[in-house]
C-alpha cells in the first residue's frame, strides 16, 4: 500500500502528540510537515524523531536548522500547506485561529481530520462552502462526533452526545461558584488541555459540540440531545425510528478516533476493548449547575452570537485560570458579552467573522475587568 502524506497542525498539543503516538504504532502514513506555536523543545524532538522537513511557526520563536523548510508568521500554515499539498491534514490547532487553518487545509488537502471546534462553531458556513467547492473529505476527530459519524443513518429520531459533566459534577451548586482552578482541572475521565478542561466543567465544550453536530451532520437543533454519562465509555449514539439505538462504546482514549480519522475506512489495530460487567448511566444536565450550556438556544441560529460566545469564553477561562475571576464569573462574562451582540447582522465573510471575534474579545475583557474589580 502506498504511503499517504500527512501534515499535523498543532503538533505539540494534546491531539497532535496523540496523533504522533498513533503514527508510531501504525504504518502507512508519512509525516511531512508540522506546525507549532511556541513549544520549541518538543517541536525539535518531533522533527528529529519523524525526520520532518517542513515546519510552520505561528508564535514568536526561532527554529534554527538549515536542513528544514521553515515558514513563519500569521500566514505560515497556509503557505506551508500550499507548498506541500498533503494527502491528509490533521487540524489540531486550538482556538479561533483554527478557522483559517481549517479553510487552508480544505483548500490544499485531500482529507482533513478535524479536531478544532471553533472552525465550525464560528465559521461553519465558510467551512461548508469550501467543502462544496473542493470536494475534500472532512472527518471529525472529537470522540463524540467520530462516534456519530460511525453510526449515522439517513433517518434518525435523535442524536445523543455524551458529556462527563466535568470535575465539579458532584459538587453542591452553592459551592461551585468558588471552585478553584486546581479543582476544575481534575477531569474525571479525560486528560486534556487547560481550557477544554474548564470548558468541560461549565459544559461550554458540549455547547460547542452541539453546534458542531448541527454543521457536520446537517441536523436541526431539536434532534440533538446531551446526556451526562459518568462512565466515559459511550461516546455518542443515534436513536432510530424503529426503536433501536446504535452507540459507540470504547475506552476514553483519543487515539481511537484519531486513528479512525487518519485511516478511514480501514480500521487499524490498537488495544482491544473487551466487554465486561459494567453499568451505564445517562442524566440530563442541570440548568443551575451548567448555566453557560443552556445559552445554546439563544445562540444556535446566529454565527455572530456563536462567535461572541466563543470569544467571551476564551477571555473568561483565561481570567479564571489566572485567578482574576471566580468560576461562576465565566458564565457572567459570556452572558454580558452576548448582550452586546443581540441583533448583530450575520457575518458573510471570513473578515466579518474575525471582526466579530476581536470585538467580542474587547467587550469580554471589559466585563472581566469589571468583575475582577468587584472581587467576583
From Swiss-Prot:
List residues binding 1-deoxy-D-xylulose 5-phosphate: 117, 143-144, 164, 187, 200, 205-206, 209
Q: Which GO terms describe its biological process?
A: isopentenyl diphosphate biosynthetic process, methylerythritol 4-phosphate pathway involved in terpenoid biosynthetic process
EC?
Answer: 1.1.1.267
Cofactor(s) needed: Mg(2+); Mn(2+)
Listed under catalytic activity are: 2-C-methyl-D-erythritol 4-phosphate + NADP(+) = 1-deoxy-D-xylulose 5-phosphate + NADPH + H(+)
For this protein, the record's Pfam families field holds: DXP_redisom_C, DXP_reductoisom, DXPR_C
Q: Which family does it belong to?
A: Belongs to the DXR family.
- Protein purpose: Catalyzes the NADPH-dependent rearrangement and reduction of 1-deoxy-D-xylulose-5-phosphate (DXP) to 2-C-methyl-D-erythritol 4-phosphate (MEP).
Q: Write the protein's name.
A: 1-deoxy-D-xylulose 5-phosphate reductoisomerase
Could you tell me the gene encoding this protein?
Answer: dxr
Amino acid at each position: 500500500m502506498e504511503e499517504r502524506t500527512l501534515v499535523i497542525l498543532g503538533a505539540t498539543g494534546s491531539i497532535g502528540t496523540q496523533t504522533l503516538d498513533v503514527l508510531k504504532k501504525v504504518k502507512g502514513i508519512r509525516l511531512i510537515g508540522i506546525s507549532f506555536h511556541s513549544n520549541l523543545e518538543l517541536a525539535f524532538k518531533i522533527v528529529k524523531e519523524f525526520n520532518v522537513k517542513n515546519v510552520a511557526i505561528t508564535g514568536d520563536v526561532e527554529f534554527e536548522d538549515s536542513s528544514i523548510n521553515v515558514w513563519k508568521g500569521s500566514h505560515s500554515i497556509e503557505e506551508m500547506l500550499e507548498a506541500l499539498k498533503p494527502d491528509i491534514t490533521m487540524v489540531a490547532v486550538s482556538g479561533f485561529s483554527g478557522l483559517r487553518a481549517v479553510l487552508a487545509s480544505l483548500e490544499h488537502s485531500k482529507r482533513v481530520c478535524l479536531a478544532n471546534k471553533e472552525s465550525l462553531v464560528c465559521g461553519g458556513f465558510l467551512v461548508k462552502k469550501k467543502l462544496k467547492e473542493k470536494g475534500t473529505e472532512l472527518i471529525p476527530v472529537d470522540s463524540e462526533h467520530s462516534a456519530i459519524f460511525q453510526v449515522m443513518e439517513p433517518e434518525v429520531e435523535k442524536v445523543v452526545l455524551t458529556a462527563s459533566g466535568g470535575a465539579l459534577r458532584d459538587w453542591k451548586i452553592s459551592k461551585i461558584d468558588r471552585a478553584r482552578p486546581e479543582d476544575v482541572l481534575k477531569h474525571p475521565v479525560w486528560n486534556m488541555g487547560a481550557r477544554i478542561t474548564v470548558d468541560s466543567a461549565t459544559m461550554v465544550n458540549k455547547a460547542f459540540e452541539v453546534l458542531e453536530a448541527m454543521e457536520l451532520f446537517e441536523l436541526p437543533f431539536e434532534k440533538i440531545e446531551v446526556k451526562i454519562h459518568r462512565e466515559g465509555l459511550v461516546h455518542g449514539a443515534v436513536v432510530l425510528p424503529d426503536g433501536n439505538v446504535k452507540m459507540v462504546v470504547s475506552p476514553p482514549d483519543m487515539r481511537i478516533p484519531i486513528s479512525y480519522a487518519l485511516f478511514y475506512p480501514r480500521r487499524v489495530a490498537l488495544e482491544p476493548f473487551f466487554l465486561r460487567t459494567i453499568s451505564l448511566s445517562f442524566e440530563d444536565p442541570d440548568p443551575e449547575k451548567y448555566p453557560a450550556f443552556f445559552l445554546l438556544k439563544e445562540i444556535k441560529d446566529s454565527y455572530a452570537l456563536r462567535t461572541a460566545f466563543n470569544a467571551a469564553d476564551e477571555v473568561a477561562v483565561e481570567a479564571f485560570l489566572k485567578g482574576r475571576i471566580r468560576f461562576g464569573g465565566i458564565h457572567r462574562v459570556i452572558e454580558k458579552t452576548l448582550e452586546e451582540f443581540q441583533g448583530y447582522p450575520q457575518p458573510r465573510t471570513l473578515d466579518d467573522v474575525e471582526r466579530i471575534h476581536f470585538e467580542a474579545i474587547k467587550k469580554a475583557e471589559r466585563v472581566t475587568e469589571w468583575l475582577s474589580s468587584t472581587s467576583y
